Structure formats: structure tokens, C-alpha cells
């Protein structure tokens, strides 16, 4: 059986990698071996950081809610507990948006939480 060289397949695979490496600095965008290493590393970073982004946004929302809660005389944990006791099902993303864009509505929720904490 004759030897089969993978010409078209190899070329296609290498073109795909170099296309993904577009915009990289130095040899990383032009040389296949270096580009392949960087593309693999970049894809790993992308996979990891798609999960990290969800954690980062949750942290940001909590920081914003805590700052607004303290302006209304509550800590973050007491605000969340009070809202839970009141049966308010507003998620952290919506609360953070209210804290930034509609302080009056957030203050009403904080007052509701205070009232339910004192029961």
C-alpha cells in the first residue's frame, strides 16, 4: 500500500489555526507551531473566563447592592434577609440595576426589608 501524505488536510488544519491566530503579536500570528500553542492557550483562557465572568458579575452586583443598602442604613446580608422574609423575589442583577439607576425604588425595597426584619 502506498504512503499517503496528508497535504490538503494538513494545509486546511494549519490555515484554520493561523486564522484563529490573526492579530497576535510577533511570531504568534505567522508561524504554525507557535501560533498553535498560543491558540490552544487562548481557547483555554476563553473557556475558563466564560465561567469566571459569571462570578465576576455576581461580585459586582453584590458590591453595588451593599453600597446602596448601607446608604439606607442596612448591611447587604440584612437587606437580603429582609427581602426574603418579605417574599420579594428580585434577583441581584435587578437589585444592582435599581441601586444604580433608581435609588428611590431601591430605598422603598430597603424600607420594606427593614419593616420585615423588625417583625
UniProtKB/Swiss-Prot annotation:
Keyword Cytoplasm annotated: no
Record InterPro entries: Ribosomal_bL20, RIBOSOMAL_L20_CS, Ribosomal_protein_bL20_C
GO CC, alphabetical: ribonucleoprotein complex; ribosome
KW Transferase (keyword) present: no
GO molecular function: rRNA binding; structural constituent of ribosome
One of the GO BP terms on file: ribosomal large subunit assembly
UniProt keywords, alphabetically: Ribonucleoprotein, Ribosomal protein, RNA-binding, rRNA-binding
Function: Binds directly to 23S ribosomal RNA and is necessary for the in vitro assembly process of the 50S ribosomal subunit. It is not involved in the protein synthesizing functions of that subunit.
Family the UniProt entry places it in: Belongs to the bacterial ribosomal protein bL20 family.
HAMAP family: Ribosomal_bL20 (MF_00382)
UniProt protein name: Large ribosomal subunit protein bL20
The species this protein was found in: Geobacillus kaustophilus (strain HTA426)
